[in-house]
């Protein structure tokens, strides 16, 4: 189960690296409209519905958050998350 979560996180990180140039142009246009948008906590699930409860619980135990501007010093990048059409960095303690 941990291997699946790790592989999913690596896949999402690779996806973020490819989508990063597009995200930068979106952030530049959105900064004028929403200059002080706060970080938002979002639940993330992977795979089939049977294992999703365990995976969501693991992310909560790790203390994962979707951050717009990057992780804090105590956190590490663990992938990406999406809310609507915006991509965020998934940061875990």
Swiss-Prot record:
Disulfide bonds join 64-92, 66-81, 71-91. It holds the Pfam family Defensin_propep. This is Alpha-defensin 26. Residues 1-19 form the signal peptide. Its main location: secreted. May have microbicidal activities. Keywords: Antibiotic, Antimicrobial, Defensin, Disulfide bond, Secreted, Signal. Residues 25-40 have a biased composition (Acidic residues). Residues 20-58 form a propeptide. One of its GO terms (biological process) is defense response to bacterium. InterPro entries: Alpha-defensin, Alpha-defensin_C, Alpha-defensin_N, Beta/alpha-defensin_C. Belongs to the alpha-defensin family. It comes from the Eukaryota. One of its GO terms (cellular component) is extracellular space. PANTHER family: ALPHA-DEFENSIN 1, ALPHA-DEFENSIN 1-RELATED. Residues 24-55 are annotated as: Disordered. It is found in: Secreted.
């Amino acid at each position: 189960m941990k291997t699946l979560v790790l592989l999913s996180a690596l896949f999402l990180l690779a996806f973020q690296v490819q989508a990063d140039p597009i995200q930068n142009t979106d952030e530049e246009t959105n900064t004028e409209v929403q200059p002080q948008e706060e970080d938002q906590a979002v639940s993330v699930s992977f795979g089939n519905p049977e294992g999703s409860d365990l995976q969501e619980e693991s992310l909560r135990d790790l203390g994962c958050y979707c951050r717009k501007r990057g992780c804090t010093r105590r956190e590490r990048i663990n992938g990406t998350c999406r809310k609507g059409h915006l991509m965020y960095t998934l940061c875990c303690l």
